[in-house]
């Protein structure tokens, strides 16, 4: 009985990986064994950094809120404590946007919680 090989599936599998390796430098883009490892590593970095991205943005929002609050002589922690106590349901993303792009609206919130 002759050996059975599924060349169609094999080619499709390799083609998929090589397509993902487009734009890589050197042998990573055109040598199967190297490209396979490079794509696998890239996928693990992408997974890790999707989580990291959320942390980075949260810390950026906190920095922006802190900067806006300190202009009015209040620390970030004092401001956020008073925001929660007054029942203002704006999240950090929105507060940071107000502090950066709409300072007068942010100042109004600050005056409300003081």
UniProtKB/Swiss-Prot annotation:
The keyword Acyltransferase does not apply. GO terms for biological process: ribosomal large subunit assembly; translation. The keyword Ribonucleoprotein applies. It holds the Pfam family Ribosomal_L20. GO terms for cellular component: ribonucleoprotein complex; ribosome. Gene3D superfamilies: 6.10.160.10, Ribosomal protein L20. Keywords: Ribonucleoprotein, Ribosomal protein, RNA-binding, rRNA-binding. GO terms for molecular function: rRNA binding; structural constituent of ribosome. CDD domains: Ribosomal_L20. HAMAP family: Ribosomal_bL20 (MF_00382). Belongs to the bacterial ribosomal protein bL20 family. Binds directly to 23S ribosomal RNA and is necessary for the in vitro assembly process of the 50S ribosomal subunit. It is not involved in the protein synthesizing functions of that subunit. This is Large ribosomal subunit protein bL20. It comes from Flavobacterium johnsoniae (strain ATCC 17061 / DSM 2064 / JCM 8514 / BCRC 14874 / CCUG 350202 / NBRC 14942 / NCIMB 11054 / UW101) (Cytophaga johnsonae).
